[in-house]
Regions:
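Soluble, non-membrane globular domain cores that form compact, hydrophobic packing
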Residues: 1-232
C-alpha cells in the first residue's frame, strides 16, 4: 500500500538518474516520489507527468537500454538491473527497490500492477507512435524523440538542427543488424507532405544524401510526410 506521496521539482530527477533538460523537453513540469509497503518490504516509484501519452512513451524509450526486458503480462513496461519502467497515460513511471529491501521480481511486478494495471487504456495505446519495422531491429534500441536535447544525445554526429523539431517534427531512431554490421535508421515524421519535402530537400543538399562518402554515407528517401535516413 502507498505510505508516502511527495511532489518534487523536475530538477530532483537527477537523484534518480534522470536529466531535467530531457524531462522538460517531453513536457514534464513536476514529479512525484511515492513509497510503498509490500507486506514487510519497501519499494518506491517516481511518477513523471509528460505532455501527453506519446511524450511519456518517448521518455521510456530515451531511458531504456538494450539490457532491459519486457515485463511478462504487463504492457509497455520494462525491467532491468536498476528496476522497472512503465508508461500509463501521460505518466512515465520508474519503480525500484531500495538495496536493503529484499523484494522479489514478482513483488516488483505486483507493484507495477498496483500502480498502473496491466496495460494502458485503448485510447492511450492508440495514441502511441507506431513501432519501427521489427525485422533486424535490435531489441529496445528504438528511441522516440520530440526535440533537440534528446536528439543530440542519441545522434551526436548528426545535424540535428536540420530535423525540424521547431515545425513539430517527430523522430524515431532504431539500430538494426544487417549481416554482421549495425546500422542506425532515422524516421522523421512531419505534419504535412509539403513540410517533409522541404525538410528532406534541405537535408539532401546539406548532408549529401545518397552520395557515396564511404563510412560517412547517408542514404534516404521520402514517402508522403515521412523521411527515412540510414545513417551508418
Amino acid at each position: 500500500h502507498l505510505t508516502i506521496s511527495e511532489p518534487m521539482g523536475v530538477d530532483a530527477v537527477r537523484q534518480f538518474c534522470g536529466d531535467p533538460a530531457i524531462e522538460r523537453e517531453y513536457g514534464v513540469k513536476t514529479i512525484v516520489l511515492r513509497k510503498y509497503h509490500l507486506g514487510s518490504k519497501q519499494a518506491e516509484a517516481l511518477l513523471e507527468e509528460a505532455a501527453d501519452p506519446s511524450a511519456a512513451y518517448g521518455l521510456l524509450t530515451f531511458y531504456r537500454t538494450e539490457a532491459m526486458q519486457p515485463v511478462k503480462g504487463i504492457e509497455v513496461a520494462l525491467t532491468g538491473p536498476s528496476g522497472a519502467t512503465m508508461v500509463r497515460g501521460r505518466f512515465y513511471i520508474r519503480a525500484w527497490v531500495p538495496p536493503a529491501s529484499q523484494v522479489s521480481e514478482n513483488d516488483l511486478r505486483a507493484l507495477l500492477i498496483y500502480v498502473g494495471g496491466t496495460g494502458p487504456s485503448p485510447e492511450d495505446a492508440a495514441s502511441l507512435p507506431p513501432p519501427l519495422p521489427s525485422s533486424g531491429l535490435i531489441a529496445h534500441s528504438e528511441k522516440y524523440l520530440l526535440g533537440l536535447e534528446a536528439a543530440r544525445r542519441i545522434l551526436p554526429n548528426f545535424r540535428t538542427d536540420l530535423m525540424g523539431f521547431s515545425q513539430s517534427a517527430e523522430a524515431q531512431v532504431g539500430s538494426y543488424l544487417v549481416g554482421e554490421n549495425r546500422a542506425t535508421v532515422l524516421a522523421l515524421h512531419y505534419p504535412t507532405p509539403q513540410m517533409a519535402r522541404v525538410r528532406y530537400g534541405a537535408m539532401e543538399s546539406m548532408l549529401g544524401i545518397n552520395q557515396d562518402k564511404g563510412r560517412d554515407s547517408i542514404y534516404g528517401r521520402r514517402t508522403g510526410s515521412v523521411a527515412i535516413l540510414i545513417l551508418d
